[in-house]
Structures are given as C-alpha cells and as structure tokens.
C-alpha cells in the first residue's frame, strides 16, 4: 500500500490556528483569560455546570499569545508532516482530534480532582497525541520512519515532558493525556507497512 505524499491537513491546521489567533488579536487580547473564555477556551465550571461541551474542541484552536502559538505550530508542522505522510490524512486527523479531546477530558478530570479552575487552551494536547502516534509508528517500522528514529522520538517525548513539569502554567495532565490517547489511537489505526523480508 502506497503511503500518502500529501500533508494537506497539517498545513490546513496550521493556517486555521494562525488565522484564528490573528483574528482574535484584532478583536481583543488573546492573553486575557476572560476574553479567551468568551471565544471558546476551556473553563471547568462552564463545562461541568453549563454543559458547554463544545469547548473541548474549540479550545484546541485557541492560543494565549504569539509565543504559545508559534511553539505549537512549529511542533505541529514537524510532527504532523511526518505522521500524515506515513498514515494518510484521515487517520492523521482522527488521531489529532481524538488526542485533543481526550487530553482535555483528562485535564478536566484532574481539575475536578484538584479543584483547580484554570482557563486552558491550546493545541498542545493534540500535538502530544501526534508524538505518541509517531512513537507507535516507529515501533511498528522497526525503529525508523523517514528521518525519524525511535530514540529521537523518545528523547523528544522525555524532553517535552521535562520542560512541562519544570515550568509554570503548563497543563501537564493534558500533555500526558494527549500522549497516551495518541499512542493508543495509533495502535488501533496503524498496523505497519514494513515486514521482515524473507530470504529466497
């Protein structure tokens, strides 16, 4: 089976995220929590009490400032390009959104457990899902896909988690949740294309 040569969805997601950010920057201040809640950021009381479940999706497309946006878009471009090219656009999108929503649900569960009422937004949960999916893909392809190696992906996972847990204001529950959701979704969707060759 030929792998897809197109990475249209990765490019589209980057354009959409950047477009939404610059539109909101024109309308107000994306670094203001109240403003971001108005436009779809995740806030536990509005989901638990007002059943505004759409926020589990809308918050994936929102970012608190240009640095937050650019960091996520660089990672989305690098990881998405490799993953979408390998598994195809449909499975890529499925992993992206399952990971993003799953990450937000796990973040909400942690908020409920800790009583934290933080406003959260960003594509990082979905992007960690791509990282988890790529980890499974390289495992299935005997340690390498394109220029990516299993060691490289594992190092990226550990480094990303380290920076998350040693920084403030980071939704680590969403990151870990996205990573797990992406890995498990990839296990279900991707069965590998490389098999050991038999000598004749």
Regions found by a protein language model. Name each.
Residues 1-200:
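A detector for small-residue-rich transmembrane helices and their helix-helix packing motifs
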